[in-house]
Amino acid sequence: FQKINQGYISAKKQNSTLELQKLYKKNKFKNNLSFKKTLESKLKLNLNKKINKVAVHLKIDMKNKLGNAKLKVWFNFFKKLENTNTKFIMIGKYHYPKKFYNLNNLYIVSHKECLLKMLIISKNCDFFLGSATGLSTINLLNNKPYIIFKHPNHHPKIFKKELNNKKKLLFQTKNQLIINEFETEKTLMKYYEKFKK
């Protein structure tokens, strides 16, 4: 996915921010997720170029609820923006509450779709919002803006080590943030207003 020295960073290392930062120190790569052009052309969504396209991934894990998205907050956020020129594209393997499917500014990609298609869809959106999960981790290497919400009680010591006393990971650009706090409607709206076209 991420090119480095004429090759690619392994999927295992791409899922570790510590490993990515080591590689960044050594190679100073520029974030640029890449896929085979034929695959990307085949699997991306063909949406109106004039609208804001926001990829969203929310964690809804019934077995491990720590870090789950605050669905009421997200629903209210989407509802407030229902009559704007923004389309929120939900990716992931979770089933969302029925009321989410009734919002006309929400496009929910089938949970049966392959992971590769979801990643390509996410890459081709204008920015990304979501919970800290494996699927979100791939977006760390995108060159688009993103806000990822990490549960403040989920591995706090590891996260502190990853940041290494800094506010951001080494390879993150200006408009790429992992926020170690709970999502609120106010926070979501703040970054939506900042990143929208």
Where are these regions (language model features)?
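Well-ordered, non-membrane alpha-helical segments in soluble/globular domains
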Residues: A69-F77, L119-S122, M189
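Leloir-type glycosyltransferase catalytic cores
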Residues: F1-N48, F159-K197
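Short catalytic/ligand-binding loop motif for oxyanion handling, primarily in non-cytosolic enzymes
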Residues: M62-K65, P97-F100, T137-I138, H155-F159
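Catalytic donor nucleotide-activated moiety binding site of glycosyltransferases and closely related
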Residues: I51-M62, L71-L115
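Active-site and donor-binding regions of nucleotide-sugar-utilizing enzymes
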Residues: F1-S10, K93, K117-I121, L135-T137
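A donor-sugar binding/catalytic signature common to diverse glycosyltransferases
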Residues: K117-E162
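Charge-rich alpha-helical segments
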Residues: N52, K65-G67, L71-K72, Y146-F149, ...
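Flexible, charged surface loops at secondary-structure boundaries
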Residues: N46-K50, K79-N83, I120-N124
